[in-house]
């Protein structure tokens, strides 16, 4: 497990994240795809980071590899957020973090990509649970996302394998 400490992720923030994630979980494939479509709408050049999208003539929403990838990213992000306070840190296995860091490094992911993703994630969550959305919920998800990204960035170096 990563040992990056959590900077006061409160019980209230945890409750907001857990409550919204429990509603979104059943639609994670659809919401993950929405997240990535938003990312590519904001930053079309980000598509070049994905080998399976580079030469694809298929519309993004029909790409057979995008939906499973998008769902796994969305689920990992949300599960990590939901467990942040209880665990006291980002709960992605260290081997997974190292792999995520190395992959993001290899493909040239930069801070702006993480910022675009954060904006798209918050927008996706806001649309998924509009009746729950509040400034407090936005702050809770922002803090959880920032901690996950911090953990990934700490591993962004060339792969040792």
Curated annotation (Swiss-Prot):
Keyword Acyltransferase attributed: no
Cofactors demanded by this protein: heme b
Consequence when changing residue 102 to V: Reduced shoots and roots length. Decrease in long infection threads and nodules during rhizobia-legume symbiosis, but increased incipient infection threads. Enhanced transient accumulation of nitric oxide (NO)
Function of the protein: Phytoglobin that reduces nitrite to nitric oxide (NO) under anoxic conditions (e.g. during flooding or in waterlogged soil) and upon root nodulation. Required for general plant development and during nodulation, especially for the onset of symbiosis. Monitors nitric oxide (NO) levels during early phase of the nitrogen-fixing symbiosis and buffers oxygen in functioning nodules. May not function as an oxygen storage or transport protein. Has an unusually high affinity for O(2) through a hexacoordinate heme iron because of a very low dissociation constant.
Result for mutant: residue 136 to K: Reduced shoots and roots length
Catalytic function, reaction form: Fe(III)-heme b-[protein] + nitric oxide + H2O = Fe(II)-heme b-[protein] + nitrite + 2 H(+)
E.C. number(s) listed in UniProt: 1.7.2.-
Family annotation (SUPFAM superfamilies): Globin-like (SSF46458)
Pfam families per the UniProt record, alphabetical: Globin
Chain's gene name: GLB1-1
Globin domain segment(s): 8-157
Keywords tagged on the record: Heme, Iron, Metal-binding, Oxidoreductase, Oxygen transport, Transport
Family listed: Belongs to the plant globin family.
Organism whose genome encodes this protein: Lotus japonicus
InterPro entries: Globin, Globin-like_sf, Globin/Proto, Leghaemoglobin-like, Leghaemoglobin_Fe_BS
Name of the featured protein: Anaerobic nitrite reductase Glb1-1
Site positions (Homodimerization): 138
Cofactor note: Binds 1 heme group per subunit.
Induction comment from the UniProt entry of this chain: Induced by nitric oxide (NO), after treatment with the NO-releasing compounds S-nitroso-N-acetyl-DL-penicillamine (SNAP) and sodium nitroprusside (SNP); this induction is repressed by the NO scavenger 2-(4-carboxyphenyl)-4,4,5,5-tetramethylimidazoline-1-oxyl-3-oxide(cPTIO). Triggered by ethylene, auxin, cytokinins (CK, an equimolar mixture of kinetin and 6-benzyl-aminopurine), polyamines (PA) and jasmonic acid (JA) in roots, and by abscisic acid (ABA) and ethylene in nodules. Induced by hypoxia and cold stress in seedlings roots.
Assembly and oligomerization: Homodimer.
Enzyme class: oxidoreductase
Motif (Homodimerization): 41-45, 111-123
Binding site for heme b: 51, 65, 69, 99, 103-104
């Amino acid at each position: 497990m990563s040992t990056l400490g959590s900077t006061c992720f409160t019980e209230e923030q945890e409750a907001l994240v857990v409550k919204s994630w429990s509603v979104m979980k059943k639609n994670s494939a659809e919401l993950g795809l929405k997240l990535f479509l938003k990312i590519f709408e904001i930053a079309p050049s980000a598509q070049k980071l994905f080998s399976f999208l580079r030469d694809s003539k298929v519309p993004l929403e029909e790409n057979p590899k995008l939906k499973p990838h998008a769902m796994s990213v969305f689920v990992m992000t949300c599960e990590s957020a939901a467990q942040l306070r209880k665990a006291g840190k980002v709960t992605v296995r260290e081997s997974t973090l190292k792999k995520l860091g190395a992959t993001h490094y290899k493909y040239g992911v930069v801070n702006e990509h993480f910022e675009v993703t954060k904006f798209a994630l918050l927008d996706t969550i806001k649309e998924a649970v509009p009746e729950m959305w509040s400034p407090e919920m936005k702050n809770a998800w922002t803090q959880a996302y920032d901690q996950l990204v911090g953990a990934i960035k700490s591993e962004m170096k060339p792969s040792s394998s």
